[in-house]
């Protein structure tokens, strides 16, 4: 009996050891560093350092990087560089010419090296009413375009750049644009209730009659922190004219409260720890800002950080100036 027990323990040990070894192998593969070529590495380093540059220098550097990436031979790293640059190019006001070069580069990379469709996701829909001869959950695959196409469609839809006709006819690009349009439709018809740092409850629909600027942010987000003083300045300047600014964070109050206190932010900061409102607005990256007019219509939005000058232009669309 003792020998059988010992044998089971030995077998269990080796099974556990194999599982741990497999987990370590997977973790190691996931953390494997990207290997850049001699031509790619300097560009990757420059992209990594963009946020440390002054805005006027950053604009020129971003444009120069877009042109240099375009000259690289086709590769997965070339696409990676183009996507990374695109994600940073919208953090402020670097000029239309700069954004156009970034979009042109991303489009050209996708033309020369198209990204395959990702594996379909499986959506599970639980039946609310019992059906005869059926039980459990119904599933259906949904096809999401690859992220680079979403990134390019985002630049076109929200930054108003242009891309070649053959890209706009691409099936994944069209799917990405359709997804963005559907997301905006959701944002047109929503309501939510959240509590602020003091425990006061705020309901979005009860703010009709005011221009409401909803800003999604986090304490760890550099561009969020950078635009916070401009949001505070706008709130102080236009609150008497009916502007309400609502900051929404998915972090704990213990992190948010000292940050807000140290920066003397006076507009309401709401907590969304379960990310229900983030999901309602389809927020997948921050900062994101949505501006609603006095009738509750979505009048303007920004996909990234904005300068005070840019915010003023957006507020004009909602009737604040």
Segments from the language model and where they lie:
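A short beta-strand-turn-helix
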Residues: 193-212, 238
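N-proximal helix/coil linker or "cap" segments that precede and/or mark the start of modular domains
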Residues: 143-191, 205-208
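Mature extracellular/secreted ectodomains of secretory-pathway proteins
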Residues: 61-166
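Thiol/disulfide oxidoreductase modules built on the thioredoxin-like
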Residues: 259-266, 271-318
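Bacterial N-terminal signal peptides
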Residues: 11-23
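Bacterial N-terminal signal peptides that target proteins for export
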Residues: 2-14
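Structural microenvironment flanking redox-active thiols in thiol-disulfide oxidoreductases
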Residues: 225-263, 273-280
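Short pre-active-site segment immediately N-terminal to redox-active cysteine/selenocysteine motifs
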Residues: 210-212, 216-220, 252, 285
């Amino acid at each position: 009996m003792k020998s059988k027990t010992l044998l089971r323990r030995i077998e269990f040990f080796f099974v556990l050891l194999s599982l741990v070894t497999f987990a370590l192998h997977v973790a190691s593969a996931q953390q494997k560093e990207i290997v850049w070529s001699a031509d790619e590495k300097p560009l990757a380093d420059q992209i990594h350092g963009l946020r440390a540059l002054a805005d006027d220098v950053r604009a020129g550097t971003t444009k120069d990087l877009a042109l240099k990436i375009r000259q690289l031979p086709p590769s997965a790293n070339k696409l990676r560089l183009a996507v990374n640059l695109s994600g940073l190019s919208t953090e402020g006001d670097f000029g239309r010419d700069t954004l156009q070069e970034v979009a042109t580069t991303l489009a050209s990379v996708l033309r020369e090296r198209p990204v395959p469709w990702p594996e379909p996701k499986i959506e599970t829909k639980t039946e609310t009413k019992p059906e005869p001869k059926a039980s459990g959950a119904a599933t259906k695959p949904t096809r999401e375009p690859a992220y680079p196409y979403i990134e390019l469609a985002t630049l076109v839809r929200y930054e108003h750049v242009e891309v070649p006709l053959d890209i706009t006819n691409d099936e994944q690009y069209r799917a990405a644009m359709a997804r963005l349009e559907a997301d905006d439709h959701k944002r047109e018809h929503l309501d939510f209730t959240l509590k602020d740092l003091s425990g006061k409850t705020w309901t979005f629909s009860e703010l009709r009659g005011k221009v409401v600027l909803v800003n999604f942010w986090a304490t760890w987000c550099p561009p969020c922190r950078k635009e916070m003083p401009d949001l505070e300045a706008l709130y102080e300047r236009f609150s008497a004219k009916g502007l309400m600014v609502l900051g929404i964070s998915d972090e704990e109050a213990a992190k948010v409260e000292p940050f807000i206190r140290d920066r003397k932010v006076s507009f309401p900061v709401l907590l969304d720890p379960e990310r229900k409102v983030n999901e309602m607005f389809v927020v997948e990256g921050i900062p994101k800002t949505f501006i609603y007019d006095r009738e509750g219509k979505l009048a303007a939005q920004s996909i990234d950080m904005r300068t005070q000058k840019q915010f003023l232009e957006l507020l004009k669309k909602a009737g604040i100036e």
